[in-house]
């Protein structure tokens, strides 16, 4: 087999055939031919620019108009070719009247496609040619390109019309293996290989296998850290070219994929597909272990790690591992001290967006999560979930080391440090380590000299809340407010005022007597 050329991927029309296409079909043809040429150049195929491409780039017709005369509109092709080949009417018309007509000259005796049917007998003559073509189309996916020129052209035209077919909304090609439907035969063919292919390309680093070498090569970059695709705008690099293309839309603001249901737009087609499931309620990704279903494949993968216990994302700073990359990214901020999310009300900053959302409720006083058992309300849903365990007595978090159980996962995590002796929260000022982040926060106040806890009674300030509570006891013992009437002393002015009422009543009773 010779090297690939532009001729192998090009479709040519005569003036007669070109005039038979409508404007949309002509524009589609231009786009497909230009795309095919660009793909060859991208693949490094040494091709000189064909005259056809030059014409199309300049917006000219794909031939020399002076060499052709206007001809009458051709007759309709035999009715047998209007059955079952393509369910979409637009594609059916285009293929029947143009593509088969164009390739009839290759000499297939039974396919007299340049001649329209004028009688029943003549129509019967074409029946044999149609049956043979139809048989080719129903062959196995691996053999479809071994059929004659007619089937090859048939497949090429289906691919070139992929965008047009998508707009019809018809999914007419169904996979017999899993029932999934496709709007294009080529997409079904590609999908069916997933059922038959063996993952024979194995990663030597981790053992993961892939069906095609290109996917293995992309995967290897996870281990090597290679990111050959760099954004010229901001310098960010990616290990897959498609990721770079998607990233570029951040700079351009382009969101070409629109939801017909609610009008929301997206910069990735996959994001639109995932979004649509919000409207349909579809959850196609099901966990075989527990039956839980998800609307996004990545969510299923993350969920599976609950069963396997896998935690592939490890912190280089302290060695702690996580089952999701987002959890690792959040954790890293403990070490860096980075706080991206700032409250506009008071200026306080947080390392997680969920934390600032919760914090804002301090200012608004909102407590949307209410306990049906006792009526107590909470700012955060997880606090309500934890609170409910007081009523149920549930303690689902058990220490494997000593068997002690807890009603909060955070309490178990804190408890485990007793066994490990780990102190992951380190003070950058003096190097002292702590087992809990809250303890580190309290410790930092020693260096800042900050005293946020103020006594309302005397105005004295303290750096710890517990110290303030101890101080308050002093005021409880003191009794600076003395009654002038009887000499009795009190530690609060409000109590003294209530006491004075006793003397007022006594005086009024004396006057009555």
Swiss-Prot record:
It is found in: Nucleus. PROSITE patterns: KRAB, ZINC_FINGER_C2H2_1, ZINC_FINGER_C2H2_2. Residues 4-75 form the KRAB domain. One of its GO terms (molecular function) is RNA polymerase II cis-regulatory region sequence-specific DNA binding. A zinc finger (C2H2-type) spans 173-195, 201-223, 229-251, 257-279, 285-307, 313-335, 341-363, 369-391, 397-419, 425-447, 453-475, 481-503. One of its GO terms (cellular component) is nucleus. One of its GO terms (biological process) is regulation of DNA-templated transcription. InterPro entries: KRAB, KRAB_dom_sf, Znf_C2H2_sf, Znf_C2H2_type. It comes from the Eukaryota. The keyword Lipoprotein does not apply. Disulfide bonds: none annotated. Keywords: DNA-binding, Metal-binding, Nucleus, Repeat, Transcription, Transcription regulation, Zinc, Zinc-finger. SMART domains: KRAB, ZnF_C2H2. May be involved in transcriptional regulation. Belongs to the krueppel C2H2-type zinc-finger protein family. PANTHER family: ZINC FINGER PROTEIN, ZINC FINGER PROTEIN 771. This is Zinc finger protein 723. The gene is ZNF723.
């Amino acid at each position: 087999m010779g090297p690939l050329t532009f001729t192998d991927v090009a479709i040519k029309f005569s003036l007669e055939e070109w005039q038979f296409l409508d404007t949309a079909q002509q524009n589609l043809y231009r786009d497909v031919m230009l795309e095919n040429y660009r793909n060859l150049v991208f693949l490094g195929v040494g091709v000189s620019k064909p005259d056809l491409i030059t014409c199309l780039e300049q917006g000219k017709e794909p031939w020399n108009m002076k060499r052709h005369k206007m001809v009458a509109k051709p007759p309709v092709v035999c009715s047998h070719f209007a059955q079952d080949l393509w369910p979409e009417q637009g594609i059916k018309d285009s293929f029947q009247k143009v593509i088969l007509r164009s390739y009839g000259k290759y000499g297939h005796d039974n396919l007299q496609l340049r001649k329209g049917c004028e009688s029943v007998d003549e129509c019967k003559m074409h029946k044999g040619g149609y049956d043979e073509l139809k048989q080719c189309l129903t062959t196995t996916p691996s053999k479809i390109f071994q059929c004659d020129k007619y089937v090859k052209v048939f497949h090429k035209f289906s691919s070139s019309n992929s965008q047009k077919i998508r707009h019809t909304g018809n999914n007419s090609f169904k996979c017999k293996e899993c029932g999934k439907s496709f709007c294009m035969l080529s997409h079904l063919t590609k999908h069916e290989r997933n059922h038959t292919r063996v993952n024979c390309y194995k990663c030597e680093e981790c053992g993961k296998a892939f069906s095609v070498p290109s996917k293995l090569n992309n995967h290897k970059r996870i281990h090597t850290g290679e990111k050959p695709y760099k954004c010229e705008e901001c310098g960010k690099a990616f290990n897959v070219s498609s990721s770079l293309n998607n990233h570029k839309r951040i700079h351009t603001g382009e969101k070409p994929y629109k939801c017909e249901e609610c009008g929301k737009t997206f910069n990735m087609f996959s994001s639109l597909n995932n979004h649509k499931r919000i409207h349909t309620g579809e959850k196609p990704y099901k966990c075989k272990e527990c039956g839980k279903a998800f609307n996004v494949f990545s969510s299923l993968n993350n969920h599976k790690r609950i069963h396997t216990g896998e935690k592939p994302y490890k912190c280089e700073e302290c060695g702690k591992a996580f089952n999701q990359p987002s959890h690792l990214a959040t954790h890293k901020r403990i070490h860096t001290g980075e706080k991206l999310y700032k409250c506009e009300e008071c200026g306080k900053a947080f390392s997680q967006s969920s934390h600032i959302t919760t914090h804002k409720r301090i200012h608004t006083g909102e407590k949307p999560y209410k306990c049906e058992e006792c009526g107590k309300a909470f700012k955060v849903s997880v606090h309500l979930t934890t609170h409910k365990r007081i009523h149920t007595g549930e303690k689902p978090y058990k220490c494997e080391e000593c068997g002690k159980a807890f009603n909060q996962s955070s309490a178990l995590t804190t408890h485990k440090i007793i066994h490990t002796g780990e102190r992951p929260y380190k003070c950058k000022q003096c190097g002292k380590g702590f087992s809990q982040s809250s303890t580190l926060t309290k410790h930092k106040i020693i260096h800042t000299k900050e005293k946020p806890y103020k006594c309302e009674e005397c105005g004295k300030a303290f750096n710890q809340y517990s110290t303030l509570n101890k101080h308050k006891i002093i005021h409880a013992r003191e009794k600076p407010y003395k009654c002038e009437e009887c000499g009795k002393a009190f530690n609060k002015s409000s109590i003294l005022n209530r006491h004075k009422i006793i003397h007022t009543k006594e005086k009024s009773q004396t006057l009555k007597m």
